[in-house]
Amino acid sequence: MTSRPITPLLDTIRGPSDTRGLSVAQLEQLAREVRAEMIDAVSVTGGHLGSGLGVVELTVALHHVFDTPDDRIIWDVGHQCYPHKILTGRRDRIRTLRQGGGLSGFTLREESPYDPFGAGHSSTSISAGLGMAIGSALAGDARDVVAVIGDGSMSAGMAYEAMNNAGAAKSRLIVILNDNDMSIAPPVGAMSAYLSRLLSSKSWLSIRTLAKEIVARLPDALERTAKRAEEYARGMVTGGGTLFEEMGFYYVGPIDGHRMDHLVPVLRNVREAGRDGPVLIHVVTQKGKGYAPAENAPDKYHGVSRFNVVTGVQEKAKPQAPSYTAVFGKQLVAAAAKDHRIVAVTAAMPGGTGLDKLAAAYPQRCFDVGIAEQHAVTFAAGLACEGLKPFVALYSSFLQRGYDQVVHDVVLQKLPVRFAIDRAGFVGADGATHGGVFDMAFLGCLPNLVVMCAADEAELARMVVTAAGHDSGPIALRYPRGEGVGVEIPEDPQPLAIGKGRIVREGKGVALLSIGTRLQSCLEACEILAARGLTPTVADARFLKPFDEELVADLAARHEVLIVVEEGAIGGFCSHVATWLANQGLLDGGLKLRALHIPDRFFEHDAPEVQCAKAGIDAQAITTAVLDALKLETSATIDAGALKA
């Protein structure tokens, strides 16, 4: 274990106000110390490393120039917010990042007044910032609102919708484009820095405003010529910006995001200019800046487990079974080898969804559309219209962003699009913003859609094959984050019969009906109940839609107690089963039905097993539900012969 970094200047900082009297040289020292503190903290907790390292200087400069928290700084996505948390009074808890009861890995309104807007998903900052800017203006509050957004997030349409609105509204909003996909090249040198300072100065803004007013009075032909001349001139000196200018933004940049002597003057100029209308400052940074392993392999150090600071080697437990993501990726490649019509679509997550394997094997059949879930879904619908078999691989929480397209463009038209829904259920340290707990509720209500839920990796393999062969309409398969349970995966997985579940263990008296990941908890509960003399039947529903009505009716007829268990929110599988049982009159004869699902609240970051325990869907909760239904104490001895056979 390495010793804590030496941070004499940072040790004197209790909040952003303590940075405002510092010189540029002191700000540079503070940035170095914040970077060292962040590296050390993330080496202990794991988390998002590279993006935060890339914005250390920018973070220090922003809090130095702007009067936070009265001025608002909104961090898009939030991966990069660790330096911000260190500077805003949370340094003493920075080594609790993403731990149960500790700091969130994202910005969180209830955590600090310096977090004016919560994040986790991308491309929301400009919309939120514009709302805050207009809201403040209507209230008569003179404050600055700054939205910091990465170049990756600019691939989403929402960012441009917000910019279009901001340009038309002419509200005072500062957008900082954190461009970490460019190398720092000559355009970001001394001359560019000088021009950026000039273009952001109050005097230049005044001259330019006057010039625009004069041009507006010219005849149309002369006005067009003058505007075109200005575009050419600004393009030559700034290296770009015409697009943003056309959307109504005043463009400044690009500037070196790691040079405090470049950042501070530009930020101060923009703030002091007090210009009405939005401004975009183009800042070029390097992901992983200041930590060699992260600079050399930014993709591997975006999100990290615990690691050795000196070597950069991450601590990773030896896997006991392949991950569900890996199983999906492997099976999709196998299916694609047999059917040339299979293609895949991902929204900027080829590695995270396992599609990198397909991209390597069949690069022409794998499409990464960027952070654009809405487009991804409708693009896949178009592919299906032309006879292809598209698999759209998204995290459950990100599928929410394309829900209207699922309904309107796919399901309504019965197009055979396959949805591979990764990270279904609790996701642990990423918390509420990334939890995949709503998809069963929002997909289960849609006509024409088949929804499968994998209980283990072998079931997932069969579901990939099932989806590949399903051409009569849309179909979804959902599966959790992390490793499988260790079951053997068949060499040649066979498709499932649509809408048919399975009995996993025969018993009597009590039936446990699980869907998806909760099957293992049901089996664990059986072991606990066996010590009480109970031998429950265990069934795996496999399908949310259409669920196996024959199986449910059989379980209801043969048992006194039916416990339905899902790792999903209210309105999902439990609701479907309960409604059907009631409408069929199968609850009229005294069947004791209990529904175990995720309660009606959000669950913050913690270990997945802790989240399941808190939600009341783990083995102990299932055991308790059975005993309560039978009106038995946990220590009671069961007369198994008295139960319904």
Swiss-Prot record:
Recorded catalytic activity of this chain's protein: D-glyceraldehyde 3-phosphate + pyruvate + H(+) = 1-deoxy-D-xylulose 5-phosphate + CO2
CDD domains: TPP_DXS, TPP_PYR_DXS_TK_like
Cofactor note: Binds 1 Mg(2+) ion per subunit.
EC number: 2.2.1.7
Residues annotated as binding thiamine diphosphate: H79, G120, H121, S122, G152, S153, N180, Y291, E373
Gene Ontology terms: biological process: 1-deoxy-D-xylulose 5-phosphate biosynthetic process; glyceraldehyde-3-phosphate metabolic process; terpenoid biosynthetic process; thiamine biosynthetic process
Alphabetized InterPro entries for the sequence: Dxylulose-5-P_synthase (IPR005477), THDP-binding (IPR029061), Transketo_C/PFOR_II (IPR009014), Transketolase-like_Pyr-bd (IPR005475), Transketolase_BS (IPR020826), Transketolase_C (IPR033248), Transketolase_CS (IPR049557)
One Pfam entry name: DXP_synthase_N
Top EC class, one word: transferase
Residues annotated for Mg(2+) binding in this entry: D151, N180
Family the entry assigns: Belongs to the transketolase family. DXPS subfamily.
HAMAP family xrefs: DXP_synth
Function: Catalyzes the acyloin condensation reaction between C atoms 2 and 3 of pyruvate and glyceraldehyde 3-phosphate to yield 1-deoxy-D-xylulose-5-phosphate (DXP).
Subunit-structure text: Homodimer.
Protein name in UniProt: 1-deoxy-D-xylulose-5-phosphate synthase 2
Protein species of origin: Rhodospirillum rubrum (strain ATCC 11170 / ATH 1.1.1 / DSM 467 / LMG 4362 / NCIMB 8255 / S1)
Origin organism lineage: Bacteria, Pseudomonadati, Pseudomonadota, Alphaproteobacteria, Rhodospirillales
